[in-house]
Amino acid sequence: MKRTFQPSNLVRKRRHGFRSRMATPTGRAILRKRRAKGRHKLSA
C-alpha cells in the first residue's frame, strides 16, 4: 500500500509557504495568530 506522506519541498512551500499564507485573508489571520503566540517559525 502506498503511504499517505510523499514528501516534496515544492508542494510543501506552495501549500504552506509564507506567500501562500499572505495570499488569503484567513492565511494572514494564521500568520497574525502565530506572531501573537511568539512562534519563531511562521510558515513552512
Curated annotation (Swiss-Prot):
Coiled-coil intervals, chain numbering: none
PANTHER family tied to this protein: LARGE RIBOSOMAL SUBUNIT PROTEIN BL34M, MITOCHONDRIAL RIBOSOMAL PROTEIN 34 FAMILY MEMBER
Organism lineage string: Bacteria, Pseudomonadati, Pseudomonadota, Alphaproteobacteria, Rickettsiales
Any one GO CC term of the record: ribosome
The entry's keywords: Ribonucleoprotein, Ribosomal protein
InterPro entries membership: Ribosomal_bL34 (IPR000271), Ribosomal_bL34_CS (IPR020939)
UniProt record, GO biological process: translation
Positions with biased composition (Basic residues): 30-44
Protein name: Large ribosomal subunit protein bL34
Matching Pfam families: Ribosomal_L34 (PF00468)
Family per record: Belongs to the bacterial ribosomal protein bL34 family.
Segments for region (Disordered): 1-44
GO MF entries: structural constituent of ribosome
